[in-house]
Amino acid sequence: APAGAECSAVSVMDMLREALPLTVEAKGKDVISQSEAMYVNLLAAGLQSSEGKPVREYVDAAMKAVAKMLAAANDDGGFGWFEGMKSSPIVTAVVLERFAGLRERKLLNVVSDELGEDALDAFDDAVVSAVRYMDSVYFGDPDRPVWYGCISLWQYLNVRSMYVGVPFDEAAARKALGAKNYNEFKKAVKAYLVPKKGERWSDGAILSK
């Protein structure tokens, strides 16, 4: 590494830690804002934990946001913008993206360490239901336009690829689309998995829109 690079990296991390607020409150009562608060508080908790510092305030703030998100989870598995509202594919996709980001960065471990292994069980169950909701929405009404609150194929595949552990019901998808359209879908999946030069998987991310 170039001379001074290590010191520079340490300084940046120190700056991040010093800039941490006590906790982050959601900017609004909507699920998108709550998911952001959950994410930021657990990110802060992760930074604190790496230094051996207390994280309970951050974890409690994150779980407060989780509780409000769960209140907006519907029987069909999707999340509405607010509690009592109809499920939205866009809102649900954002929740799934952010949860996957926390999982990938191993920030969910902070919650388990602080509150116990079962602390996120309810949210884990809601996430699995949300993935199945995304499947049902996309294959239940594939002609529903994006502007009507649905998501594009690329956005669906981006989110779905984060949850390969949730079984995909190929038979149901084939039945919903028909043989011809399902074959087209498979071609699109292949094109997504093997992007052309200059393209990236993240091009379909909901949060990048």
PLM-predicted stretches and their roles:
Residues 199-200:
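Short strand->helix junction
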Residues 1-172, 179-189, 193, 204, ...:
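Extended, solvent-exposed functional surface patches
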